[in-house]
Amino acid sequence: MSKFEVYLDEGGKYRFRLRARNGQIIAVSQGYKSEEGCIKGIQSVKENAPNARIIVLE
């Protein structure tokens, strides 16, 4: 199962990464000042991604 991981980066900001079932990192977030803000970012991705359009840039 894919999973979101929350971690503290070297600059002291909270970030999340999305890992695929095979362990590959497929997305990394911006830095957040708080763990709570980071978790809200994850919730936003989970709520909005099902409706996201796919755009191929050429």
UniProtKB/Swiss-Prot annotation:
Lineage: superkingdom: Archaea
Gene3D superfamilies: YegP-like (3.30.160.160)
One Pfam short name: DUF1508
InterPro entries cross-referenced by the UniProt entry: DUF1508 (IPR010879), UPF0339_domain (IPR051141), YegP-like_sf (IPR036913)
Alphabetized SUPFAM superfamilies for the sequence: YegP-like
Family: Belongs to the UPF0339 family.
Name the record gives this protein: UPF0339 protein MA_3316
Organism of this sequence: Methanosarcina acetivorans (strain ATCC 35395 / DSM 2834 / JCM 12185 / C2A)
Biological classification of the source: Archaea, Methanobacteriati, Methanobacteriota, Stenosarchaea group, Methanomicrobia
